[in-house]
């Protein structure tokens, strides 16, 4: 009797390593997919492939997730110009692209059974499950959630489970839970979870202040219809742009912060995050929009943007409302063309120059300096513009007297 195929989102870590023998003992032929979204080097990719083979998978597939994460998430996030709760730039949104890779593999194998290694306490389980459910009638198996029903020390249980079956466990145990991809890095655990100051080890790409270069960094980013297409005059693919900006701005400590916010399941979450490239892109794009969008566009767009960010954070990546909002966002980018010059001396980044044919200026007019209208026109505008407030004050003064 042939075993039923199941496709597992695999990272090579303890949780997903445990999932393979666990699922095999449930009667499945396990096929693993590793979606490389930019968080590993070639050596780590090789380790993941060998680890899957060691654990006895039926097949293993590595997928380049860089183009998908740019086209499916980064472009739209930059269009919004927003972060979750005004701070966090949605750095684990690669989960949705990982799901896509898993489902494509499942469809190719003709199976509806898929699995992931998410725990039952975090946000990722929500993102994985909702993204899967939105795309078809798939059966979701979550082994870590299953064992958490019976075991409180789940990681110790997983280690023992693997060792009893002859599989080694990496001797080096990390002090922090680290998520790394093209978007950036998040760190949690240890003193971070205890609401204390992060230790020196709680650092990813971003250099500490003592290591910042003495000379300032200046970088020019070109946008076409809201999408970054070149850095310092050199055309690059989206993933290449983000990788380059990550490297440049990380050396100046740009994009690092401590975030405390509301998780999907209602708990408070606290992480250290680093997103140097995204921070640079968002800063540049916002400066260009400020110059080329109308007053009403710049006023209204943040309402749409905040809702889009909330939907993505909370797992509604495939909700029709998200698609509707993206239609508006894409339309708003028609004139977001030009080049922004960014500058950093460390820690923060500023847009210091804007170059675009779409800047909303008028010949002969400079704010607070020169104008092509008369004094009487200005006075008339002020009178009409403030009519409601002026009448309110007049009426209430007369009533009080």
Curated annotation (Swiss-Prot):
ATP binds at residues 9-17, 35, 117. Gene3D superfamilies: Argininosuccinate synthetase, chain A, domain 2, HUPs. L-aspartate binds at residues 119, 123-124. One of its GO terms (biological process) is argininosuccinate metabolic process. Its EC number is 6.3.4.5. Pathway: Amino-acid biosynthesis; L-arginine biosynthesis; L-arginine from L-ornithine and carbamoyl phosphate: step 2/3. One of its GO terms (molecular function) is ATP binding. It is an enzyme of class 6 (ligase). GO terms for cellular component: cytoplasm. It holds the Pfam family Arginosuc_syn_C. L-citrulline binds at residues 88, 93, 123, 127, 273. InterPro entries: Arginosuc_syn_C, Arginosuc_syn_N, Arginosuc_synth, Arginosuc_synth_CS, Arginosuc_synth_type_1_subfam, AS_cat/multimer_dom_body, Rossmann-like_a/b/a_fold. Keywords: Amino-acid biosynthesis, Arginine biosynthesis, ATP-binding, Cytoplasm, Ligase, Nucleotide-binding. It catalyses: L-citrulline + L-aspartate + ATP = 2-(N(omega)-L-arginino)succinate + AMP + diphosphate + H(+). The keyword Ribosomal protein does not apply. It is found in: Cytoplasm. Homotetramer. NCBIfam families: argG, PRK04527.1. Belongs to the argininosuccinate synthase family. Type 1 subfamily. This is Argininosuccinate synthase. The gene is argG.
């Amino acid at each position: 009797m042939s075993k039923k195929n199941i496709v597992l989102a695999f990272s090579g870590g303890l949780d997903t390593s445990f999932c393979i023998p666990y699922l095999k003992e449930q009667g499945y032929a396990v096929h693993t997919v590793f979606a490389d979204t930019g968080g590993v080097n070639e050596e780590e990719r090789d380790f993941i492939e060998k680890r899957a083979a060691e654990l006895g998978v039926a097949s293993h597939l590595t997928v380049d997730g860089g183009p998908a994460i740019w086209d499916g998430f980064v472009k739209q996030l930059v269009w919004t110009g927003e972060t979750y709760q005004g701070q966090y730039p949605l750095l684990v949104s690669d989960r949705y692209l990982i799901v896509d890779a898993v489902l494509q593999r499942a469809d190719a194998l003709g199976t509806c059974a898929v699995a992931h290694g998410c725990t039952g306490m975090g946000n990722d389980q929500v993102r994985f499950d909702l993204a899967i459910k939105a795309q078809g009638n798939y059966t979701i198996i979550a082994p870590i959630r299953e064992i958490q029903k019976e075991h409180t020390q789940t990681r110790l249980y997983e280690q023992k489970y693997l060792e009893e079956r002859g599989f080694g466990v990496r001797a080096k145990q990390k002090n922090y839970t680290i998520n790394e991809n093209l978007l950036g890095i998040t760190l949690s655990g240890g003193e971070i979870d205890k609401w204390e100051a992060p230790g020196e080890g709680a650092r990813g790409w971003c250099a500490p202040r003592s290591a910042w270069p003495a000379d300032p960094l200046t970088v020019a980013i070109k946008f076409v219809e809201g999408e970054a297409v070149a850095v310092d005059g050199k055309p690059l693919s989206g993933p290449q742009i983000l990788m380059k900006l990550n490297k440049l701005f990380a050396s100046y400590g740009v994009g690092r912060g401590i975030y405390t916010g509301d998780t999907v399941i209602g708990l408070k979450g606290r992480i250290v995050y680093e997103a140097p490239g995204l921070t640079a892109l968002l800063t540049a794009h916002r400066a260009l929009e400020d110059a080329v969008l109308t007053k009403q566009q710049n006023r209204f767009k943040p309402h749409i943007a905040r809702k889009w960010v909330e939907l993505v954070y909370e797992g509604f990546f495939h909700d029709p409302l998200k698609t509707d909002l993206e239609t508006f966002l894409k339309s708003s980018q028609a004139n977001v063309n030009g080049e922004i010059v960014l500058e950093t001396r460390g820690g923060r980044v500023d847009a210091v120059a804007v170059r675009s044919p779409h800047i909303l200026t008028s010949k002969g007019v400079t704010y607070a300096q020169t104008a092509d209208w008369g004094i009487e026109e200005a006075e008339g505008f002020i009178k009409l513009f403030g009519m409601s407030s002026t009448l309110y004050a007049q009426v209430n003064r007369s009533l009080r007297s």
